[in-house]
Amino acid sequence: MRGGSSLDSFPGKGTLHTLEIENFKSYKGKHTIGPFTRFTAIIGPNGSGKSNLMDAISFVLGEKPSSLRVRKYADLIHGAPINKPVAKKCRVTMNYKYSDGKVKAFTRGVNNGTSEHLLDGQTVTSAAYSQEMESINIFIKARNFLVYQGAIENIAMKTPKERTQLFEELSRSHEFQAEYERLKVEMTKAEDDTQHNMNKRRGIAQEKREAKMEKDEAEKYQTMKNELAAKSTMLFLHQLFHCERTIDESKEEINAQKKTIASLEATRSKEEAKIAAVHQEHRKALREVQKMTRKLDQKETDLAEKQQNMLTLKVSVAHEHKKLEIAKKMLAAAESKAENNSTQLADLKKSKKELEKKKAAYEAEIQDMMQRGELNLSDEQVREYGQLKDQAQRESAMVQRELLMAEQVFEGDKSSLNHELRRQKEHQERVKAKEGDVRRIETQIATLAQRIKETEEETKILKADLKKIENDVVIDKSAAAEYNKELVAVVRQLSEASGDSAEGERNQRRTEALEGLKKNFPESVYGRLVDLCQPSHKRFNIATTKILQKHMNSIVCDTEETAAKAIVYLKDHRYPPETFLPNDALVVNPLNEKLREIKKPAGVKLVFDVINPQHQAARKALQFVCGNALVCESQEDAKQLAYGGGELKDRFKAVSMDGTLFQQSGVMSGGSADLRQKSKKWDEKVVKQLREKRNQLNEKIADLQKHRRRELEVESVRSKINGNEQRLAMMKRDLKNMREMQLERLQNELEGMTAEMNMLPPRISNCQEKLERSESTLKSLQTKSNEVADRIFADFCTRVGIASIRDYENREMRIKQEMEDKLRSFDDDIQKLAYEIDFVTEQDGNRKVEVEKEKVSQIDRQYKDMKKKEKTAAAALKEHTESMEQDKEVLEEKKALSHKLETEWNEVKKIAQVAMKDFTKAEKELLRLESLLTKKQYERHSLLHSVKLGQIALPLKSGSMADVEYEEDDGDDTASQSSQSATDGPSVSEEQIQREQHIKINYDSLPREYKDVDDDDGVRQMSNRLNVEIDELQKNVSKMNAPNLKANQRMAEVKEREAESTEELENARKKAKRIRQQFEKVKTDRYRRFQDFFDPVANTIDDIYKQLSRNTSAQAFLGADNMEEPYLDGIQYNCVAPGKRFRPMDNLSGGEKTIAALALLFAVHGRNPAPFFVLDEIDAALDNTNIGKVASYICESAREHMQIIVISLKEEFYNKADSLIGIFPYPAACTTSGVLTFDLTRFKQIGLNEMTENPPTPSIAT
C-alpha cells in the first residue's frame, strides 16, 4: 500500500502488520493484505467477502469451524461449497509486528481436512500455538480482540449471569472455580462429619446408662423361664403319647381295608373295560357325525361363496355387454366420420388438380401472346426508344427515384392488404373447423354425462339395497348376540344348579316315556306333578317335598281310561312303571278354611296355599295329595299342632320347614338329608326348563349362522358399489378432462382465433387507407414523370403514330399486370385447397376407426371370457348342490348309528355304576383311615417341631431331635397352636415323617393320670389345663422385658466405643479447620483476581460512555449483585442516555444499545487490551450523529491506545479511517473476492485540492 503510515512507534506490545490469505473461502489464490494502520476500515458491497476476511482473522487466531459458519475444516477451502475445491489445503498467516520491529508469523491452515498450526514456518501443537497467542494478550475463549457481525447488541443484552461469566473468563478467575467448588463441598462434608461425631458421642453416653439396667433383670427372668420349660415338657409328653397310640391303631385298620378294596377293584376293572369298548365305538361314531357336520358346514359356506361369485359374474357380464354396445356405437360414429373425411379429401384433391391444369393452360396462353406481340417496332425505333427513355430517366432522375420508392411503398401496401385478406379468409375457415371440434367434444361430454348419471342412479339403488341388507345383517348379529348372551346366562344357571351334568339312565328313560305319552295323548296327559306346580318360595321346598314325596313324579291325566292306555303304552315300549293321577277318579275332601286363620303358633300355612299350580289341571291332583296338611316354622310348632296343642285343639298333619313330619297318630318322620336331595326335584324342573331354553337358543343361533350368506351378499353389493364408484371416478375424471382440458382448450383456441379474426377488419381498413394514400402519391409522381416523358417522346410518338408513349407502355404493363393477378389468383386458390387437404388429412379418421375397432375387439374378448366363466360357475354350483344332498343322507345314517351306540353304552354303564359304588365306598373308608393316620403323623411332626423350636428337652429312648427339620413358617411354642397346624396339614415330606419314626420318646416321667385317658375329650381337657398354666407363666414372662444376659460384655464395649468416638470427634474438628483455611485462601485469590479486573472496568466505563456519547450528562453503571463473592451472582449493567430518564437496557433503542455495548467493550479492552481490535459492522444500528461520535472516539483510541480494524458500509464512519481495504467480487460460479488497499493519511495532510488535481490510484493486493 503506497503511502501507508508506519506503526513502529505504536504504543503497546505490537500490532497486526499484514495478513496473507491463500485459497481461504472466497479468496482464491494468494493475497497479501496490509500493512494495517492504526485505524483501518474494510469496505465493500454485500456478498463481496468482507465477513470472510473477518473469518480469516478469526481462523488464524484459533476459532473453531462452527464459529466460522462452516461444519468442517474442509469447507474453508475455496470452491468447497459447490463441491469444486481449487486445492486440498488453504492457509492464513498473520504477520505480527512487535514494538521492537521484530515480526512473527502466526500461520494456521487446513490440510486434508485437518487443522495445522505454524509459528515462523515451524509446525507446532495447538496448545503451543494458543500459549503464544496468550503471550501477546489474545485470548480466543474470551474473544477480547473481535466482535462479530450482529453481536454488538447481544453484548449489551447479556443476562447478569452471562456478564459474570464473561468477566470470569476475562479476569481468569474461573481458573479457581473448580478448586473453589471442590473445597466448598469438602468443607461442608467435614463440618457434617464433626456434627455427626458429636451426636454419636452423646448416644454412646446414653447407651452406657441403659447397659447397667439390663444386668439387674437377667436373674429374675431366668427363674421364670425354667418353670415354664418344665410345664411345656409335660404338655408335649401328654400330647405325643396319645398321638402315637392313635397312629398304631389306624395302621391296623388300614391293612384290613386294603384287602377288601383289592377284591372290589377286580370287579370294577372288568366292568370298566366293557364300558371303554362300547364308549370307544360311540366316540368314533360321534367323530364321524361331527366330521360330516363340519364338512356340510364348509360346503354350505362354499355354496354361499359360489352363489355370490355367480351373482358377481352375472353383474360383470351385464356390465361388459353394456360396454360392448357403447364401444360399437363409438366405432360406427368413427367409421361414418372417416368415410366423410375420405370423400371430402378426394373432392379437394380433385379440385386442386383441376386448378393446377387451368393455371398451366393460362401460362401457355400468356407465352403464346407474348410471342405474337400486337405492337411491333423496328430495330431503329427500338434503339431510339431506348435512347429517349434513358434521356427521360436522366432528366427525371429525382422524380424517378421518388416514383420508384412510391411504387415500392404502393406494392408493399398492396401486398399487405392482400396478405391480410388471405389471413381473414384462412381464419374464417379455421374458426369454422374449430367450431366443429367444439361441437364434437360437447357431444362426447353430453354422452359421458348421461353415462355418469345412469351409473350414479344405479349406485344409489345399490347403496339403498346395501343399507337394507346391512340393517338385516346388523339385526341378525344383534339377535345372535342377544341369544348368545341369554345362552351364557342359561348355561351359568345350569352350572349353578348342577343341572347340566349327565342324567342317570333311569331318569332319562322316564323322561323319554313322558315325552312319548305327551305325543300320543297330547290333550289328555298333562305332565308330572312336580312339573305342574312350584313352591311360592324356596324356603318351602323341603316341607312341600315331604308332603308330596310319594306323588312328586306321578303323572297327571284327565281320566282313568287315559291312564289305562298310557300304562299299555309304557309296557309295549318297556319303559319303567309310572304312577298316574286321573282327575276324574280322585276323591278330594274340601279344605278346612279355619286352618287359614290360625294365629298361634305364628307362620302356620296350608301346604296347598304355599304351592302355586302352573296348570289348571294340576289343582285337583295337588289338593288330593296335600289335603289339610300344615307347614310350620319350627319342629315345636308342628309337634304342637299334630298333638292337639293349637288354637283349634284338634290334631292335624303338620310338617316343619326342615322336613320333619308329625302325623295325627303321633308318628314322627324326619330324614332331612334325604329330603334335601329329593327337594332338588324342584330345581330339576327349573333345570329342565333351562335345558329346553338352551336347546331353543342353540337352534336359533344355528339358524342365524345359516344367514351368513347375507354377509357375503353385503360384500358382493359393496364390491359392485366400489366398482361403480371407481368407474364414476374415472368417468368424472374424463369428463373433467374433456371440460377443463379439451373443451376449454378448444374454446380458448376458438376465442383466440375469433379475437384474432376480429382484429383483422381494422387492419384491413388501415391497409386500404395506406394503399389509397400511396396510390395518390404514386399518381402525383407519375404525372410529373409523364410530363417529362411527353416532352421528350413528342416527336417519336408523332412518327410512330401513337398519341402518347404511355399508351404503348401501359398496354404492355396492363397485360403483364393482368397476367400476374390471374396467376396469383390461381396460386391463392391452390394454396387454400392445399391447406384444407392438410387439415382433413390431420383429422386421420382411419386411425380413430382402428383405435375404436381395437377397443371393441378387446371388450368383446372380455365379454366372452366373462360368459365362459359364468357358465363354468353355474356348472360348479349345480355339482356342489348335488354333493351336499348326498352328504346330508350320509349324515342322517351316521346320526342313527351314534344314537344306537349311545343307548348300548348307557345300559353297560348302569351295570358298572353298581360295582363302582361299592368300590368307591370302600375307597372312601380307606381314605378316611389314611387321612386320620396322616393327620396324626403330621400332628406328631408338628409337636416335635414345636419342641425343637421351643428348645424343650424331651426324654428320649432312641433317636435325636436333630432328625426334626425346621419349617419355613411362623409357629408358636404352645401345644394348642401346634395342634392347629397339624389339623391344617402342613407341608412335610414323607421322608421327614419316616426319619422321625426313629425318635422313641421315654414316657416314664409322664404321670399315670395323663396316660389313662381314653377318649379325645379327656385328652383335650388335660391339654387345656396345662395350656392355662403355661399361658399364665408366659404372661408373667412377657410382662418382663427380656434381659440381656451379656450386660457386662456390653458395658465394656460401650466404654471402648466411647473412647473411639472422642478421638474421631477431635480428628474431624482438625480436618474441618484445615479445609476451611484452604477454602478461604482459594476464595480470597478468586475474589482478588476478579476484582482486580472488574474494579478498573467499573471505574472507567462511565467516562468511556460519556466520551462515546459526547455528553457529560450520560451515565453508565456496572455493579455486582453479590459484593462479597461477585462471581457467584450476576453483574448489573445500566446506562442513562443523554437527556433521557433511566430505562432498563432492553427498553433502549438500537443505537443506544450499540453505544452501551461499545462502552462495555472498550472498558473491558482497556483493562485487558489485545494488540488490536476487530469490529464487524458495529455501526449497523447507528444514525449519522452517533456514527460520528463513535468514529471520533475510535480515532482518538487508535492514536492513543490500540490498533482498530472495522468492517463498515457507512461512509460517515469509514471516511475517518487512516486506510481503507476494499473487497470486491469477481464474476464466477463461486464467489471470488478481490482486495484493494487505499491510504487516506496523505489526504488528511494535503487536503482536497491536491487530491482533485492528482487523483490517487488504489493498489491491488497480491
Curated annotation (Swiss-Prot):
Disruption phenotype: Defective chromosome segregation during germline mitosis, resulting in aneuploidy. RNAi-mediated knock-down is embryonic lethal and results in aberrant chromosome segregation in mitosis. A motif (DA-box) lies at residues 1148-1183. One of its GO terms (cellular component) is chromatin. Keywords: Cell cycle, Cell division, Chromosome, Coiled coil, DNA damage, DNA repair, Mitosis, Nucleus. Residues 965-994 are annotated as: Disordered. InterPro entries: P-loop_NTPase (IPR027417), RecF/RecN/SMC_N (IPR003395), SMC (IPR024704), Smc1_ABC (IPR028468), SMC_hinge (IPR010935), SMC_hinge_sf (IPR036277). Residues 974-991 have a biased composition (Polar residues). It comes from the Eukaryota. Residues 524-642 form the SMC hinge domain. Its main location: nucleus. GO terms for molecular function: ATP binding; ATP hydrolysis activity; DNA binding. It is found in: Nucleus; Chromosome. Residues 171-497, 680-937, 1017-1086 form a coiled coil. It holds the Pfam family SMC_hinge. Gene3D superfamilies: 1.20.1060.20, 3.30.70.1620, P-loop containing nucleotide triphosphate hydrolases. One of its GO terms (biological process) is response to UV. Belongs to the SMC family. SMC1 subfamily. Involved in chromosome cohesion during cell cycle and in DNA repair. Required for chromosome segregation during mitosis. Central component of cohesin complex. The cohesin complex is required for the cohesion of sister chromatids after DNA replication. The cohesin complex apparently forms a large proteinaceous ring within which sister chromatids can be trapped. At anaphase, the complex is cleaved and dissociates from chromatin, allowing sister chromatids to segregate. Component of the cohesin complex, composed of the smc-1 and smc-3 heterodimer attached via their SMC hinge domain, scc-1 which links them, and scc-3. Interacts with smc-3, scc-1, scc-3 and tim-1. This is Structural maintenance of chromosomes protein 1.
